[in-house]
Amino acid sequence: MKTNNQLKNENAITLIALVITIVVLLILAGVTIASLTGNNGILTRASDAKIETAVGAVKEALKLEQGEKRIEGEQLTPETLLAEGKVQRTVQQEEDGNYYMYYALKNNAIEGMQGLGKGNIVELKDVFLIDDNLNVKYISNNGKEYGDTINNKILEDETKIRFASKAFSDYVSKISGVTEEEMKFKWMKNQTSLTITDSSVDSLQDLVFFPNLTSLQLGTNSSDAPQIISMDGVENCTKLENLKIYYGPDKDYSTVEKLDNLETFYRYAGTDYNNIIDGLKECKNLKSFSVISQNITDMSRIAELANLESLDLRLNQIEKIEGLENMTNLTDLKFDFNRIEKIENLESLLKLKAIYLTSNNISDITPLSANISLTTLDLRGNSQIDGERSNYTGQRLVALDKIERKYKKEFYNKF
């Protein structure tokens, strides 16, 4: 007996075959590819019709929900939809220098979206936007717009801001010295750095009102770390360059991949190393990566962060150096307090200037002779290293001499 998944797959294959057959028949009938796929082509018009139908269905669903709210003596607005978890916000600075706030429907939040609206709210692609009058506009991945003209909501310096999270609102009120009722966009707009040290904060959605942040820190110790399990909201901080996270629960970092300007990432404690790699592997400008005290045993996924210059994996359980063979931009490595027994897979790192290997299980340092740019080497706490020159012969002695000559002043090996 066939499973539902098998039937779905067969139906999908049948549909694809049908579409291909129709296209072939149309071509044989003299219909050109341009007339199929051009701006006014059959397929383009079919796609437009689907989108216009979806826009109409969403508008109708909102009207029905609005009617239900009125019966209950309430109103339906983007803010009430936000409170219900059906809408997300983004703040964009446009070419005129003004900041505009947009409300976008979340995926499948309203009946009739037909699989649309799964896109990037920060880039305003594949999104349904609504305004205070419940006008609906859909923006496709190619930037084409469908539906209503929506009223842009300008955020001026004196615009009062209402946060979605009460805990976040309380914290901002405390650090700004402004009551929640008097919070205005100007203060948030002017912040380039924000540190959140309140364990009651459990959401970053309100970072939408901090469009100019370049540095964000969550927590300083285990008692003040925000209880955030998802980094959703941080994608609105498109200028963010530095992100530091101390303690707190393991997190979903999927939205971090949208931070094109992120250069430095630091995480202390937790066990979310793989989640971090999943989220940061698309951050092509990431230069410095630190994940400390996470009991990491396998570091091979570091290879997915190809452009790193500095790597810090102190206080873990790493036994083997791996994944660095093609990371030729690395200049700084910190592996203190791990279980590394062998210096290996570093030969290609010709730009490497510093390596810290305090308190590991290393016995042979001669492989470091290949790293011609190395000027700083810390091997303290590796008691297995043989300090007797007479025990070195052949190529190992040549390598040792090379290291000693290079580090006449800088090299120290207190073991």
Show which residues each predicted segment covers.
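N-terminal leader/signal peptides at the extreme start of proteins
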Residues: 1-13
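N-terminal single-pass transmembrane signal-anchor helix
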Residues: 11-35
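Membrane-proximal N-terminal amphipathic helix
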Residues: 41-75
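Periplasmic/extracellular, small/polar-rich flexible segments of pilin-like filament-forming proteins
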Residues: 67-156
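N-terminal capping/linker segments that flank leucine-rich repeat
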Residues: 136, 141-224, 232-271, 276-290, ...
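Asparagine/serine/threonine-enriched low-complexity, disordered tracts
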Residues: 212, 239, 261, 285, ...
